[in-house]
UniProtKB/Swiss-Prot annotation:
Protein name: Uncharacterized protein Mb2104
Family: To M.tuberculosis Rv2078.
InterPro entries: DUF2563
């Protein structure tokens, strides 16, 4: 079986980058104030303001959840790459030991 650990590391880096991009989006979104009365002072405007506020809060929660998921995927890819490298190194050492003991 061939595993491209470089590609796993590259994917991990991209996943972390995407996670930080989601975090940056959440930060930018949190800076946008939803001022009372920004849509008017009549009752329907307040109802709309409340709906926009709820959607705003949900979007920020979604972005934070996406960030965490992407970072977790990146960490798992790095862990897998390390595991494959360690296993390959261990197997190579065992094979070398067998070859050397057979040669003597």
């Amino acid at each position: 079986m061939f595993v491209d650990v470089g590609l796993l590391h590259s994917g991990a880096n991209e996943s972390h980058y995407a996670g930080e991009h989601a975090h940056g989006g959440a930060d930018q979104l949190s800076r946008g104030p939803l001022l009372s009365g920004m849509f008017g002072t009549f009752p329907v405007a307040q109802t709309f303001h409340d709906a926009v506020g709820a959607a705003h809060a949900q979007q920020m929660r979604n972005l934070h959840a996406h960030r965490q998921a992407l970072i977790t995927v990146g960490e798992k890819a790095r862990h897998a790459a390390t595991g494959f490298t360690d296993m390959d190194d261990g197997n190579a050492a065992e094979l070398k030991a067998v070859v050397c003991s057979c040669a003597t």
